Amino acid sequence: MKWYPWLIKPYKKIIRLHERKKAHHAILIKTQKGMGVFKLVWFISKWLLCLKPKGTNFCDNCHGCKLMSANNHPDWHTIINEKNDVFDVDSIRVINEKIFKRAQQGNNKIIFLPNVHKLTESAVNALLKILEEPPEKNWFFLIDYNYLKLHSTLKSRCFLYRLPLPLEKESLNWLKNNNKKDNISNLTSLRINQDSPISAKNFIESDLWDERKNLYKSLSHSIKDKNLLKILPVLCKKNTIMKIDWICLLLFDAVKTNFNERKKLINCDQIKLINFFSKKYNNILLNKSIRKWTKCRYILSSVSSINSELLLLEQLLLWEKILCFITP
């Protein structure tokens, strides 16, 4: 596994807590997706399971390190329920069985829960009992992608570690070294993905990037012809919800431009479109457009029986009126 540069400091900080015997037995890592948190946990675990660690580094040569590198260490336990994608009481029973058995390599044991929000209420209650007073040398790593909704008692039983986003400049340097896109494209992808560098890389290398560009190209042509219905086939094809999000992000950028906040634009590769909306329409009309698109998105995502093409047609006709392409 390769390091991500923004994980080096968090790794060393947590390892040093273990070196000083100050580490909590349960670390709850608060982060967002696209940060490589699994690698962070894996490297920390490899150090904990290393038989001959060298300072903050694992030796990468002992039997424990070789087992980790082969993803076959008997004392590394990732708890995943593949049946229904949730952690229920049965999942916690598996944990309970693991922690009260002697470590097969005679040292530490690692319990990794990749997403605590998949825990059912009964599973949380069962886990709380385990975390209250677990056997020695059992180390729990829990990942949380939505801290606001997390069980308060579960938070209190863990050491909370917030994994910070890397600086934008640092992420851009990493993206530059890991793909062939230009700086403006990388910056746009990074901001679309809430500054998560790995998500930005995956997005810009996927078909979604081309779909986004095609949507804006089609929108530009339809604006020129004052006929927004031309983008209907593009919207209906696939990823409709995501495409509505892209339209809203573009409109938000126009609002920011009207407030002279150009440094915070998301769609840095669509300045021409942003300028069209910001110069042609005030924020009242832009906000009205965003609200109508948001309502359309909500209906599409919550009403399974809806005729999506008909709804989008209605939305585009309404948007034409808002933008004064047709008279009401």
UniProtKB/Swiss-Prot annotation:
Source species, domain of life: Bacteria
EC number annotated for this UniProt entry: 2.7.7.7
The keyword Transit peptide is assigned to this record: no
One GO process term, biological-process aspect: DNA-templated DNA replication
PANTHER family named in the record: DNA POLYMERASE III SUBUNIT DELTA, REPLICATION FACTOR C / DNA POLYMERASE III GAMMA-TAU SUBUNIT
A GO cellular component entry from the record: DNA polymerase III complex
Pfam families: DNA_pol3_delta2, DNApol3-delta_C
Gene: holB
Source organism (scientific name): Buchnera aphidicola subsp. Schizaphis graminum (strain Sg)
UniProt entry keywords in alphabetical sequence: DNA replication, DNA-directed DNA polymerase, Nucleotidyltransferase, Transferase
Gene3D superfamilies: 1.20.272.10, P-loop containing nucleotide triphosphate hydrolases
Protein role: DNA polymerase III is a complex, multichain enzyme responsible for most of the replicative synthesis in bacteria. This DNA polymerase also exhibits 3' to 5' exonuclease activity.
Protein's recorded name: DNA polymerase III subunit delta'
Catalytic function, reaction form: DNA(n) + a 2'-deoxyribonucleoside 5'-triphosphate = DNA(n+1) + diphosphate
